[in-house]
Amino acid sequence: LETWLIVAIVVAFLVWRMMPAKGVQSISAAQLKNILHDKDKVFIDVRTPAEYKGRNIPQFKNIPLGSNFNHLPKDKEIVVICQSGMRSSRACKQLKKQGFERVTNVRGGMSAY
């Protein structure tokens, strides 16, 4: 019984961690292709510089997770990508906490692109 309780708590925690942050929009890689040339959006890739150098989307600027996002314009939508969607989800939460209103995560990241 005690083991099942621990397992349930761990599963609940993992599900909670994967949930999108409040107010963060989520789009697919296919939807991303339709907005790549929108000048009212800022595209950031939060992977490491080595990952970015290996393969990237030209419209995305490399700003690794953990960097300071304060220099980004708060009046534009920020579209965030990583390799799988996990780091970009964390970056989106960080951006929302810093007061960015329009934040969008690319589901599945570069793996889905």
Regions found by a protein language model. Name each.
Residues 1-42, 46-53:
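Flexible, polar/low-complexity N-terminal or interdomain linker segments that lie immediately upstream
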Residues 37-43, 58-59, 76-77:
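Short active-site oxyanion
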Residues 67-113:
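Catalytic cysteine-centered active loop of the rhodanese-like fold, especially the PTP/DSP P-loop
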